[in-house]
Amino acid sequence: LTTGRAELDGAGNLQNYRVEQGKVSIEGKGLDGKRADSVSILARTIDVNAGVWANKLNTRTGQNNIDAKNLKATALDLSSTEIKPTIGLDVAAVGGMYANHITMVGTEAGVGVNLNGVVAGTQSVSVDANGHLSVNGTLQSDTSLVAKANSIQNTKTIASGGDLGLETKELTNTGHITSAKNGHIKVEETLTNNNTMAAGANTQGALTGNGSLSIEAGTVRNTDAVIVSGGATTINSKEVHNTENGRIYGGKVAIQTKVLENRKNVALESKLDAAMADMKAVEDKLEAAYAVDTTAFTSKTEQDEYLNRIK
């Protein structure tokens, strides 16, 4: 399925699909392509409001030249006064994509992928977005899952039954990010974890194996949350802030950082600091009020003048 224009080579063979505009929407009873070797949806934007089933499922969004043989998408350099879409691939809560292999590519700068439904692959799942990836549903593979985007926000489930790889500039997790085997997470700037990140674990973060978790980030903020693996947990970051009952566990734990903040209750510490400051102020006032006067006088006249001043 494509909104693009077929382009032929000199011999009349199909060479590319040129996609400049257009939307493909999956509605109603959905699309069952399991009898075909593969299903490919090529458009500037794609809306999935029903189920899509396939052996191999490919989506390509953005303004692209798409190779007809291998589906490699090369972004077109088009100047346009049209308003750019904010979402390239939108899987609604009532929609879903199910296949052995799923590959999602969005090339348009700043245009995101929104997954509110279920995207599930029995073999491999791959996401490559030149914008924001938002997971408010389930992004899952039984074997291998790789996701790359400018920024990633997960509120529900990102899970791999095998290895997991995430690469982004900013990662915010308030849900569960898990892998049954090894997990590698690379974040150029800030990784914020407020729930569970686990390797060697099931989708709820309970340890089931000895998979290792490797994290590379500019800054790691683990707040009232868990980073854990059944094997080695390795963090390489300029700053690591493990606060508010944050926990970092593993069979082995190695943290390489310039700044390590490991504090159980920052809010309580702030209150205690304020209380101590108040106590110090009271102490200073009491000391001033009851201090022994050691003023020295050289004459009776100086003494009388001083006593008159302090009356």
Annotate each language-model stretch with its function.
Residues 1-230, 234-237, 241-258, 263-284:
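Extracellular and secretory-pathway beta-repeat/beta-biased strand scaffolds
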Residues 271-311:
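Extended amphipathic alpha-helical heptad-repeat regions
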